[in-house]
Amino acid sequence: MQDWRAALEEYYSRYLDSALVLAIVNDSDDSNTAREILEALSIESQCDSHEEHWDNLRRDEQELLNLKTLDEEINKIDEEDFTWELKDSSLELDPDVYNFLRSMFSDLSAARVQLVQAKCQNDLVRSSDELLNHRAIQESEQIETAADALITSNIGHRSRQRKKKTKKATNSRKPLSKFQSNTEEVNEDPILKPSLSVWENNRLLIEKLTSILNIPSSQINHEFYKNSSAWPITIRNLIHRHQPLSNITNNELMKYQEEATQLAKDTGLSLKICTDVLICSNDYKNALWILCLIKETQHNEMGNIKLSSQTAKSNSSTQTKTCLNDQSSKLVEDDEALSAEDCNRLAEEYLELRNMQYSNSAKEYRRSKSNHLFGGSAMYHAQLGREYHEKALKYRSLAMRSLAHSGTSHSLDLHGATVREAKTIVRERVAAWWAKEADTSPNSIRPFVIVTGRGNHSIGLEARLLPAIVRLLQQDHWRFDAEHGQITVYGINRHSKLNSNA
């Protein structure tokens, strides 16, 4: 029952989404019903693609016409020349760059533009960034000044009453360590803001971790919800798979020991997790922020969680997914040394992994309707499914290549090949065989034997390879005999070739 489903999936996946084809094939009881549905959908998708193509062409032509019209209007406008302001300037400035900056930032003074351009050594991009920052600072200062004016005008009489002096607690004169001073800065801005919802807090934390660790937010989303929304375990797993940890040398590791020791002493976390966080963040303050997040969420959400090498086991479904992913990572690296059977087996395993990831993506997408954070997890699973699909195609291609080089110079076994693959292989092998035998006498030619099988593994137990190869050899004007799942090629059928030319 699986053979016709696999054949339909392989054929219609070229025109439709593979997940949709898989769902229709699995829901159908017989091949005819599934084929009718898929054929109708494929025809409809092809018609839609053609209409969409023509719509895109019309839209592109209209946009091009609009751009041409806009360019003509812009070219008619005379640009103002500011280069006369450089006559009395002692700075060596590029007139073209200055003219562009002056026209773009007309609200700024000429002296300010000249100083910024000289500071940036006539670099247009750097100068533009500097002037944009200056404009933003000016606007923020104006907003703060207006706000202060409103607040000052509303101050009451009681605010000017004399306050009693209170003695401040005398602090010890012991100098603050680097960690203590940075801890105060982190504590001023709480990691989990009580005024925000849980969803907003998690979104802000994911954005912060993305900027620090340079990890895609979809991957952090997936890891966070895979570990039951526990930040300590999530951060540990992300740090464990982070790229810099695998490239660190012993000399570089020694540089982080002093700061990591201080972090471990003051946070109470293990030296290993402090060192790993410091290496991955590559900044003391960022590492401190991540460790404070671990400490705070460990206390508030998870209790006394210890970040050790042995974490709590996930549920049985998570274990199954992990085992399959580990199995895919341990697949044979030497692709060229694999046989056709091994390549087909690996292709089937990758297809199973692809289907599992597409199923997980669909589940996460349905969950994202109630919680938007699951949208990133759905995208992550869909990306994994596409990667597994590409690997399955790769090993399928390797299987065809291995099959093409199998057998002897005068024989070929096509078991395990599809009709399309078999046609390509037969043409190559028969041409190579005839290149060697063409110069010999007709009585000395050694025939070429092609084994196609009797169709015992085909849908409906009907042979597919044999009729397809027979039609191919007839079209290419070969002389052959076909019987009992085997084709024997003797040479070129010259009479058939002459008749076709006539």
UniProtKB/Swiss-Prot annotation:
Keywords: Nucleus
Signal peptide: none
GO molecular function, one term: endonuclease activity
Protein name: Smr domain-containing protein C1235.03
Sequence ranges of Basic residues compositional bias: 157-171
GO biological process, one term: nuclear-transcribed mRNA catabolic process, no-go decay
GO cellular component: cytoplasm; nucleolus; nucleus
Location (main, coarse): nucleus
Domain of life of the native organism: Eukaryota
Region (Disordered): 150-184
Organism taxonomic ancestry: Eukaryota, Fungi, Dikarya, Ascomycota, Taphrinomycotina
Entries under InterPro entries matching the protein: Endo/PolyKinase_Domain-Protein, Smr_dom, Smr_dom_sf
PROSITE patterns recorded: SMR
Domain Smr per the UniProt entry, residue ranges: 411-459
Localization: Nucleus, Nucleolus
Species annotation: Schizosaccharomyces pombe (strain 972 / ATCC 24843)
TM annotation in the entry: none
